[in-house]
Design a protein with these regions (language model features):
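Conserved NTP-binding catalytic cores of kinases and kinase-like/nucleotidyltransferase enzymes
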Residues: 1-65
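Internal "kinase-insert"/substrate-recognition segments embedded within catalytic cores
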Residues: 74-78, 90-189
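Alpha-helical scaffolds flanking conserved acidic
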Residues: 182-191, 206-207, 218-220
Length: 236
């Protein structure tokens, strides 16, 4: 992290910390880079402390529109804004401003402090000699938010869910339990949304985020780094 200042919505400069964001070289290897900004705990913006400023891929709407539609569809997704980013008074062009998926993300949606799991199998998160399917191995997941006083290393809730996924292929009783943990209304809405925006970017290989709520005994997906493969055909 590097020290910096940012102009707040009230026009006043405030101390912040900033660093490059993302594992993929496309985020930081070129002139325009993706950034992560961390605010002071007592100087939050819209009840969020950490924001990601990411580079649009191709047309700006292909990243922005899916996140906007996710909220309308009732799918968990970070808030996104199209902003013009300035660094040292020089415009860097249009960026996506996204809230980070963390404890603040939960609080902003009136969700009790619970576990959020990150599933990635590419770039620095890639582990050798282990299969590529995230849903086959709990060791391929890490926590980005922790339930109350629970230990960060405790992933028993995730292990239970993944075990149910495997057992459900041959066991009706396990499938019945899985339907209570992974509710149809959560996962069907997630799948329908992916079909709507024509995206499979959240998959068993990468970009998976799960909210595990031990109080309710449920696990549901979060939209992360979604990309739409729709094309706009301009009419003459």
């Amino acid at each position: 992290w590097q020290k910096a200042h940012m102009i707040y919505p009230d026009g006043q400069p405030q101390k912040i910390k900033v660093r490059l964001n993302g594992d993929n070289p496309t985020n930081w290897a070129f002139h325009r880079k993706s950034w992560r900004v961390k605010l002071k705990k007592n100087r939050l913006i819209n009840n969020s402390r950490v924001f990601n400023y990411t580079l649009p891929q191709e047309e700006e709407w292909k990243n922005y529109l899916p996140n906007y539609l996710a909220k309308r569809a009732g799918v968990l997704a970070p808030k996104v804004n199209l902003v013009e980013l300035y660094i040292n008074d020089k415009s860097q062009g249009i960026y996506h401003e996204l809230e980070k998926i963390d404890e603040s993300f939960l609080r902003n949606r009136k969700i009790m402090p619970v576990n959020i799991y990150k599933g990635e199998w590419v770039n620095r998160d890639r582990k050798v000699i282990i299969g590529l399917d995230l849903f086959n191995n709990p060791a391929s997941w890490s926590k980005v938010a922790v339930l109350g006083l629970a230990r960060e290393s405790d992933s028993s809730d995730l292990e239970y869910f993944l075990e149910l996924v495997k057992l459900s292929e041959t066991s009706e009783s396990s499938f019945a339990r899985l339907k209570r943990v992974a509710r149809y209304e959560d996962w069907a809405r997630f799948a329908a949304f992916q079909t709507l925006v024509q995206s499979s970017h959240n998959s068993s290989l990468a970009n998976m985020r799960l909210v595990s709520d031990p109080w309710k005994g449920t696990i549901r997906p979060i939209i992360h780094d979604i990309k739409s493969f729709l094309s706009l055909q301009l009419q003459p």
